[in-house]
Amino acid sequence: MWKSFPVFREYIRYTTASSVYEARLAYEEFGSKAHTYSPAYTDTDFPVIMQCSSHITFNSFSQFRRFYSMVKASGEKISCGIRINPEYSEVEVELYNPCAPGTRFGVTADLLPETLPEGIEGFHCHCHCESSSYELEHTLQHIEETFARWFPQIKWLNLGGGHLMTRKDYDTEHLISLLKGLKARYPHLEIILEPGSAFTWQTGPLVASVVDIVENRGIKTAILDVSFTCHMPDCLEMPYQPAVRGAEALPVDAIKTALTEENIYRLGGNSCLSGDYMGSWRFDHPLQVGERIVLEDMIHYTMVKTNMFNGIHHPSIAIWHTDNTLEVYKDFRYEDYRDRMSDGN
């Protein structure tokens, strides 16, 4: 949704990127060079990464050694860093736990040399996912205990993303206190946060329609014109059951013992994947074909992970302005599907 960047520019000046395309989008459309991190850079992508980045974090010293000479020779003003792994995270879902045992992310303290290589100016870590300031407090304790002896050698500390500071119960005053305390202890360090999904938390529903209702062994499924597999993959991967406007989310297995008069439905996607369905929801009326189903909070970690499996039609992307007008950003067409696999005519 790069067309919404003017809104973001009212609040922030910088962006982050994890790939060459994200870095280009940040540079060309947002208008700032990105703080870029990737698990691995390639010879093909790295020249463009340098053009579009103010900071580049390397996942390993082997990657740093491979590409740092290119940074020096480029003439670009780029600050390089290394991703550290404090081996501590309170993220419970392993899919999103960057510090899980055996993770491919970052360098542990036992592998850091006492004297950092020339050119390493910062540390980057990412240990959170929709986390509170209190989880950050615990993480900082581990980082300082483990890595503080290297702090005199660096200029910046990037605490990554996953800070859900726009959630209603997030303690922003506690966050401010933590950051001020950290800065007081290490006044030479620039402290960086990448709040990520906090910018779009609870800002974007996915509006679907019921296209059929089927019943098998007492389980009623409302088949929608969208797909969990294609349009909401995070729901299946986590997994988590999204909020549906006007419906009560029930335990997943509740539908297996539901009575007909209870209006309890499973929601099914319109792909051919057997597992393209989710949960149990109780509605206050029997669902009808053509009825709208609004799935809440479907922007972050959902819209960006969509795919075109089965050639399923993608939902359009639009913004609802404060003057009550709707602006369509992207209306997906057959050509978008066709041209992903071969160049169009």
Residue ranges and their predicted role:
Residues 126-128, 157-166, 195-198:
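Glycine-rich beta-strand-to-loop/alpha-helix junction loops that act as flexible
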Residues 178, 193-345:
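Charged (often Lys/Glu-rich) extended helix/loop segments that serve as interaction or gating elements
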Residues 1-156, 170, 178-181, 185:
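Active-site-proximal beta-alpha core segment in soluble small-molecule metabolic enzymes
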Residues 2-6, 133-138, 166-175, 202-208, ...:
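Short glycine/threonine-rich loop-to-helix capping motif typified by GTGT followed
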Residues 88-90, 129, 165, 199, ...:
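Feature marks short, surface-exposed loop/turn motifs that line or immediately flank catalytic pockets
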